[in-house]
Structure formats: C-alpha cells, structure tokens
Amino acid sequence: VEKNLQVRPLCPQPQILRCSWEEESELPTLRELGFEEPARDERAVLDFQGGEKEGWKWMNEWTWERGRLEKYKETRNGLVGADYSSKLSPWLSGGCISAVQVYWEIKRYEEERVANESTYWLFFELLWREFFRFVGRRYGPRLFAKGGIKGEETYPGDPHRDKLERWRLGQTEDEFVNANMVELVLTGWMSNRGRQNVASYLIHDLGQNWLDGARFFERNLIDYDPCSNYGNWAY
C-alpha cells in the first residue's frame, strides 16, 4: 500500500484569520469552571501540554534537537523516558497537529539528515493509524461490538468484577502489569508495549471482556482516539 500511496501536500497557512468578535478574552481555568487542576506526577514520561504550538515544539525537539527519529525503530518498544517514541499521539488525537504534517516533517528529515528504517517506521505507524480509521469508516459501530468486525467472540470472557477492578487499580499478581496500570491512572499515558501487555493479561490471563479494557483506556488515556483504541484492542 505504502509504495503507491500519494500524500496530499500541506495546505498553505492562512495569513489572516478574521474573527466575528473584536474584544480579546481568556479561556477560563479549570478551577473557574468548578474542576480541580490535575496534579502532575513527577514520574510522567513527558509534561504534555495541549495546543498546536506545544505539539510542534515537541515534534521539533524530539525529531531535530534530540535526533530521535533516526533511532525510532530501535527504541520504539521502550517503557521509560521521553525519547523512546515520538509521543505525538496526544496532539494527533486532539487535532492539534495532523498526520499529514507529521508525514511531511519525516520527509524533510529524510532529505536534510538521513533516511533509514527508523524514519520509514514512523511513517508506517501513521499508516497503521489510518488503517484503523478506514476500518471504522467501513464497519461503523461493529468496531465497538463484543465480537468485533467479524462478529466472532473468540474470547467471550467470564465477567468477574473483582478481577477487572484489580486490573484497573494495578493490584494484580503481575507487577509489570501493575506498574503500567498505575502509570495510566496517574499520568494518562502508557507505552505501546505496556498497552499490549496489559490488554493481553486482561483477556488471556484474567479471562475478561476486551470491551471493559477498551472502555477503561477510553476514560483514562490522554491520546484516546476511538478508531485506534478499539481497533488495537480488537486486533
């Protein structure tokens, strides 16, 4: 697929945005809206800040300043620290930056620095992300069904609320699973390898319904995206 793929060029950035209002104002804080400011855990892999500027700032730092793109394939399955993966998914899921922008940034890096398996692999991950969008568009609500898009309940699960709750709280018999679940709850983030392991544990070791896991991820992930989340769980 990727050999014949044609990615559209970037749209030119508008020079002037005319607004229907004249007076400047500020967005209310969470406290002003009646919510508590979330406490940042110092163990978080990255201090994620929302918005387009922050997304571009991190992409530039990770790609160009730290030079991590050209090592991505070697480090992508890491668990700890900011460098092992791009961590662009929160900004992608929030619409702060687009997959097309990331693609052209990869191409620019390949032209100006180096093109290797790692630069290709980040592009491949973007294709994987797009694949789940095509699946969602093709199958619609079946993506969220217990039997998945095939309607096959391969692992029907044995509902056991205690097992599910211990998984959610990071209080299982597996310390690796526990560490990843605690990270998710406290920071809203979990590595890709961590996600694969805790999902496998919930389904194959605890015998629980995959949808319960997908819904818990939906409530807690800062990079939650319906197609990627449910697509990866079903996969």
Model-derived segments and their meaning:
Residues 1-151:
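Glycine/tryptophan-enriched, flexible segments
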Residues 84-235:
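Active-site-proximal binding-pocket segments
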